[in-house]
Amino acid sequence: VITLSEATSQAQVRDEFEFADLDLAISNPMSDSYAEYRCDYELWEVESGLFLYIGVNALWSEFFKDGRNDELRKALTYAIDRQAIIDAYYRGRAYPSTLPTSPGSPYYSESLASRYEYDPLRFVSAIQNMYVPKNDKGEAKKLLLLVNCDDSARLRTARYLAKQLTELGLETGTLEYGGSTGTTYEQVLRAGSYDIYLGQTKLSATYDLSQFFKGYGNLGWGGIADNTLLNMCKEALANSGNYYNLNKMVADDGKIVPVLFGYYEVYAERGQLLDLTPSRDNVFFY
Protein backbone atom coordinates (compact mmCIF):
# COMPACT_ATOMS: atom_id res chain seq x y z
CA VAL A 1 0.00 0.00 0.00
CA ILE A 2 1.33 3.43 -0.96
CA THR A 3 0.00 6.38 1.02
CA LEU A 4 0.32 9.79 -0.65
CA SER A 5 0.88 12.96 1.37
CA GLU A 6 -0.05 16.47 0.27
CA ALA A 7 2.41 19.35 0.56
CA THR A 8 2.37 23.03 -0.35
CA SER A 9 6.11 23.55 -0.83
CA GLN A 10 9.36 21.75 -1.59
CA ALA A 11 10.56 22.67 1.89
CA GLN A 12 7.55 20.94 3.47
CA VAL A 13 8.27 17.79 1.46
CA ARG A 14 11.89 17.88 2.58
CA ASP A 15 11.00 18.45 6.24
CA GLU A 16 8.46 15.62 6.33
CA PHE A 17 10.98 13.31 4.68
CA GLU A 18 13.71 14.22 7.17
CA PHE A 19 11.69 14.51 10.39
CA ALA A 20 8.36 12.70 9.88
CA ASP A 21 7.12 9.46 8.33
CA LEU A 22 7.58 10.25 4.63
CA ASP A 23 9.63 7.47 2.99
CA LEU A 24 9.78 8.66 -0.62
CA ALA A 25 10.07 12.17 -2.07
CA ILE A 26 10.66 13.71 -5.49
CA SER A 27 12.29 17.06 -6.14
CA ASN A 28 13.10 19.29 -9.11
CA PRO A 29 16.57 20.86 -8.67
CA MET A 30 15.80 23.43 -11.40
CA SER A 31 12.95 24.89 -9.34
CA ASP A 32 13.35 28.19 -7.50
CA SER A 33 11.71 26.49 -4.51
CA TYR A 34 14.19 23.59 -4.43
CA ALA A 35 15.09 22.52 -0.87
CA GLU A 36 18.37 20.78 0.01
CA TYR A 37 18.15 17.37 1.70
CA ARG A 38 20.61 16.79 4.56
CA CYS A 39 19.69 13.41 6.02
CA ASP A 40 20.62 9.80 5.26
CA TYR A 41 18.92 8.72 2.03
CA GLU A 42 19.22 6.83 -1.23
CA LEU A 43 19.02 8.97 -4.36
CA TRP A 44 18.02 8.37 -7.97
CA GLU A 45 18.34 10.87 -10.82
CA VAL A 46 15.47 10.64 -13.30
CA GLU A 47 15.61 12.51 -16.60
CA SER A 48 12.76 15.06 -16.60
CA GLY A 49 12.69 16.43 -20.15
CA LEU A 50 13.13 20.00 -18.89
CA PHE A 51 15.09 21.73 -21.64
CA LEU A 52 16.88 25.10 -21.39
CA TYR A 53 17.90 26.58 -24.72
CA ILE A 54 18.58 29.76 -26.67
CA GLY A 55 16.14 30.58 -29.46
CA VAL A 56 17.01 32.89 -32.35
CA ASN A 57 14.60 35.50 -33.73
CA ALA A 58 15.20 34.68 -37.38
CA LEU A 59 12.18 36.64 -38.64
CA TRP A 60 12.32 40.09 -37.02
CA SER A 61 15.77 40.57 -35.47
CA GLU A 62 17.95 43.07 -37.31
CA PHE A 63 20.86 40.75 -36.59
CA PHE A 64 19.29 37.66 -38.16
CA LYS A 65 16.38 38.51 -40.48
CA ASP A 66 16.69 37.96 -44.24
CA GLY A 67 19.39 35.33 -43.66
CA ARG A 68 21.86 37.71 -42.00
CA ASN A 69 24.65 36.45 -39.77
CA ASP A 70 24.27 32.74 -40.45
CA GLU A 71 27.80 32.20 -39.12
CA LEU A 72 26.99 34.03 -35.89
CA ARG A 73 23.82 32.00 -35.38
CA LYS A 74 25.62 28.71 -35.97
CA ALA A 75 28.52 29.73 -33.71
CA LEU A 76 26.46 30.66 -30.63
CA THR A 77 26.90 27.12 -29.28
CA TYR A 78 30.66 27.73 -28.94
CA ALA A 79 30.12 30.78 -26.70
CA ILE A 80 28.21 28.87 -24.01
CA ASP A 81 30.11 27.43 -21.05
CA ARG A 82 27.35 25.03 -20.07
CA GLN A 83 29.08 23.41 -17.12
CA ALA A 84 29.88 26.82 -15.62
CA ILE A 85 26.18 27.74 -15.87
CA ILE A 86 25.11 24.50 -14.20
CA ASP A 87 27.65 24.84 -11.40
CA ALA A 88 26.86 28.50 -10.72
CA TYR A 89 23.08 28.67 -11.14
CA TYR A 90 21.68 25.13 -10.99
CA ARG A 91 23.59 23.75 -7.97
CA GLY A 92 25.51 21.41 -10.26
CA ARG A 93 22.29 19.43 -10.74
CA ALA A 94 21.61 19.36 -14.49
CA TYR A 95 23.07 17.80 -17.61
CA PRO A 96 25.01 20.04 -20.03
CA SER A 97 23.94 19.32 -23.58
CA THR A 98 24.85 20.70 -26.98
CA LEU A 99 22.13 18.56 -28.58
CA PRO A 100 18.32 18.77 -28.24
CA THR A 101 18.40 15.36 -26.54
CA SER A 102 19.32 14.66 -22.93
CA PRO A 103 22.67 12.93 -22.28
CA GLY A 104 20.64 10.33 -20.38
CA SER A 105 18.72 9.37 -23.51
CA PRO A 106 19.59 6.45 -25.80
CA TYR A 107 19.23 8.91 -28.70
CA TYR A 108 22.19 11.01 -27.50
CA SER A 109 25.58 10.76 -29.21
CA GLU A 110 28.61 11.86 -27.18
CA SER A 111 30.82 12.01 -30.25
CA LEU A 112 28.34 14.26 -32.06
CA ALA A 113 27.77 16.43 -28.98
CA SER A 114 31.51 17.06 -28.63
CA ARG A 115 31.53 18.93 -31.96
CA TYR A 116 29.46 21.78 -30.51
CA GLU A 117 31.01 22.26 -27.07
CA TYR A 118 32.29 25.51 -25.56
CA ASP A 119 35.08 26.87 -27.77
CA PRO A 120 35.46 30.65 -27.33
CA LEU A 121 38.24 31.01 -29.89
CA ARG A 122 36.08 29.37 -32.52
CA PHE A 123 33.23 31.76 -31.67
CA VAL A 124 35.49 34.81 -31.90
CA SER A 125 36.76 33.65 -35.28
CA ALA A 126 33.22 33.09 -36.58
CA ILE A 127 32.00 36.62 -35.78
CA GLN A 128 34.87 38.59 -37.31
CA ASN A 129 32.79 39.63 -40.32
CA MET A 130 29.34 39.71 -38.75
CA TYR A 131 26.77 42.35 -39.64
CA VAL A 132 26.02 44.72 -36.75
CA PRO A 133 22.92 46.94 -37.14
CA LYS A 134 23.16 50.65 -36.27
CA ASN A 135 20.76 53.02 -34.55
CA ASP A 136 19.70 56.44 -35.88
CA LYS A 137 22.94 57.96 -34.59
CA GLY A 138 25.08 55.43 -36.42
CA GLU A 139 26.00 53.60 -33.21
CA ALA A 140 26.25 49.82 -33.12
CA LYS A 141 23.26 48.14 -31.52
CA LYS A 142 23.54 45.55 -28.79
CA LEU A 143 22.29 42.02 -29.31
CA LEU A 144 19.24 41.76 -27.02
CA LEU A 145 18.65 38.57 -25.03
CA LEU A 146 15.08 38.14 -23.73
CA VAL A 147 14.51 36.24 -20.49
CA ASN A 148 11.63 35.49 -18.13
CA CYS A 149 12.70 37.25 -14.94
CA ASP A 150 10.15 35.31 -12.85
CA ASP A 151 12.63 32.41 -12.90
CA SER A 152 15.65 33.53 -10.87
CA ALA A 153 18.03 30.83 -12.17
CA ARG A 154 17.12 31.61 -15.76
CA LEU A 155 17.54 35.33 -15.11
CA ARG A 156 21.02 34.85 -13.66
CA THR A 157 21.91 32.55 -16.55
CA ALA A 158 20.80 35.16 -19.09
CA ARG A 159 22.89 37.86 -17.42
CA TYR A 160 25.88 35.52 -17.41
CA LEU A 161 25.39 34.73 -21.11
CA ALA A 162 25.13 38.42 -21.98
CA LYS A 163 28.34 39.13 -20.08
CA GLN A 164 30.11 36.21 -21.73
CA LEU A 165 29.03 37.19 -25.25
CA THR A 166 30.11 40.78 -24.62
CA GLU A 167 33.54 39.65 -23.43
CA LEU A 168 33.89 37.59 -26.61
CA GLY A 169 33.24 40.61 -28.81
CA LEU A 170 29.45 40.58 -29.29
CA GLU A 171 28.00 43.36 -27.14
CA THR A 172 24.87 41.92 -25.57
CA GLY A 173 22.21 43.18 -23.17
CA THR A 174 19.23 41.52 -21.49
CA LEU A 175 15.51 42.21 -21.80
CA GLU A 176 14.01 41.11 -18.48
CA TYR A 177 10.23 40.68 -18.39
CA GLY A 178 7.84 38.77 -16.16
CA GLY A 179 4.64 38.93 -14.16
CA SER A 180 5.86 41.85 -12.05
CA THR A 181 7.07 44.05 -14.92
CA GLY A 182 3.74 45.04 -16.49
CA THR A 183 4.69 43.58 -19.86
CA THR A 184 5.08 39.81 -19.70
CA TYR A 185 7.80 37.64 -21.19
CA GLU A 186 5.32 35.94 -23.54
CA GLN A 187 4.02 39.29 -24.79
CA VAL A 188 7.53 40.28 -25.84
CA LEU A 189 8.06 36.86 -27.43
CA ARG A 190 4.90 37.31 -29.49
CA ALA A 191 5.85 40.87 -30.46
CA GLY A 192 9.25 39.71 -31.70
CA SER A 193 11.11 42.69 -30.24
CA TYR A 194 14.28 40.82 -29.27
CA ASP A 195 17.22 39.12 -31.00
CA ILE A 196 17.58 35.89 -29.04
CA TYR A 197 15.72 34.49 -26.04
CA LEU A 198 16.48 32.07 -23.23
CA GLY A 199 13.64 29.57 -23.25
CA GLN A 200 12.62 26.59 -21.20
CA THR A 201 10.19 23.83 -22.07
CA LYS A 202 9.52 20.21 -21.23
CA LEU A 203 10.11 17.79 -24.08
CA SER A 204 8.34 14.46 -24.38
CA ALA A 205 10.15 11.19 -23.72
CA THR A 206 10.59 10.88 -27.51
CA TYR A 207 12.23 14.34 -27.74
CA ASP A 208 9.66 15.50 -30.27
CA LEU A 209 10.91 18.86 -31.60
CA SER A 210 8.13 19.36 -34.14
CA GLN A 211 6.52 22.27 -32.24
CA PHE A 212 9.69 24.28 -32.88
CA PHE A 213 9.64 23.79 -36.63
CA LYS A 214 6.04 23.35 -37.79
CA GLY A 215 4.10 26.36 -39.06
CA TYR A 216 2.51 28.13 -36.07
CA GLY A 217 4.05 25.59 -33.69
CA ASN A 218 3.76 26.33 -29.98
CA LEU A 219 7.54 26.76 -29.69
CA GLY A 220 8.28 28.37 -33.03
CA TRP A 221 9.01 31.84 -31.67
CA GLY A 222 11.01 34.07 -33.98
CA GLY A 223 9.75 32.51 -37.20
CA ILE A 224 11.93 29.39 -37.14
CA ALA A 225 9.43 27.12 -38.94
CA ASP A 226 11.39 24.82 -41.24
CA ASN A 227 9.88 22.02 -43.32
CA THR A 228 13.20 20.21 -43.70
CA LEU A 229 13.73 20.03 -39.94
CA LEU A 230 10.05 19.21 -39.38
CA ASN A 231 10.27 16.27 -41.77
CA MET A 232 13.40 15.05 -40.02
CA CYS A 233 11.53 15.24 -36.69
CA LYS A 234 8.86 12.98 -38.16
CA GLU A 235 11.48 10.57 -39.49
CA ALA A 236 13.14 10.35 -36.07
CA LEU A 237 9.81 9.63 -34.39
CA ALA A 238 9.14 6.89 -36.94
CA ASN A 239 12.63 5.37 -36.70
CA SER A 240 14.93 6.12 -33.75
CA GLY A 241 17.96 5.55 -35.97
CA ASN A 242 17.29 9.00 -37.42
CA TYR A 243 17.85 10.90 -34.15
CA TYR A 244 21.55 11.27 -34.92
CA ASN A 245 20.76 13.07 -38.17
CA LEU A 246 18.04 15.17 -36.53
CA ASN A 247 20.35 16.26 -33.70
CA LYS A 248 23.11 17.11 -36.16
CA MET A 249 20.79 19.14 -38.39
CA VAL A 250 19.40 21.12 -35.45
CA ALA A 251 22.86 21.79 -33.99
CA ASP A 252 24.27 22.84 -37.38
CA ASP A 253 21.26 25.08 -38.08
CA GLY A 254 21.58 27.03 -34.82
CA LYS A 255 18.06 28.47 -34.61
CA ILE A 256 17.70 26.70 -31.28
CA VAL A 257 20.87 26.25 -29.25
CA PRO A 258 20.68 23.69 -26.42
CA VAL A 259 22.12 24.65 -23.04
CA LEU A 260 21.10 21.96 -20.56
CA PHE A 261 18.57 19.33 -19.54
CA GLY A 262 17.13 18.94 -16.07
CA TYR A 263 16.37 15.86 -14.04
CA TYR A 264 14.22 14.93 -11.07
CA GLU A 265 15.74 13.69 -7.82
CA VAL A 266 13.96 10.80 -6.12
CA TYR A 267 14.81 10.35 -2.43
CA ALA A 268 14.03 7.23 -0.38
CA GLU A 269 14.76 6.23 3.19
CA ARG A 270 17.86 4.05 3.06
CA GLY A 271 16.99 0.37 2.69
CA GLN A 272 13.27 0.93 2.15
CA LEU A 273 13.06 0.41 -1.63
CA LEU A 274 15.96 -1.72 -2.78
CA ASP A 275 14.59 -2.53 -6.25
CA LEU A 276 13.21 0.88 -7.17
CA THR A 277 14.02 2.00 -10.73
CA PRO A 278 11.99 5.22 -11.12
CA SER A 279 11.21 6.67 -14.53
CA ARG A 280 10.16 10.19 -15.51
CA ASP A 281 6.49 9.12 -15.69
CA ASN A 282 6.40 6.60 -12.85
CA VAL A 283 8.40 7.22 -9.71
CA PHE A 284 7.17 3.92 -8.22
CA PHE A 285 8.44 1.73 -11.07
CA TYR A 286 9.97 -1.61 -9.99
Model feature map: region roles:
Residues S33-E47, A191-S193, T206-G220, E269-L273:
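Ligand-binding "clamshell"
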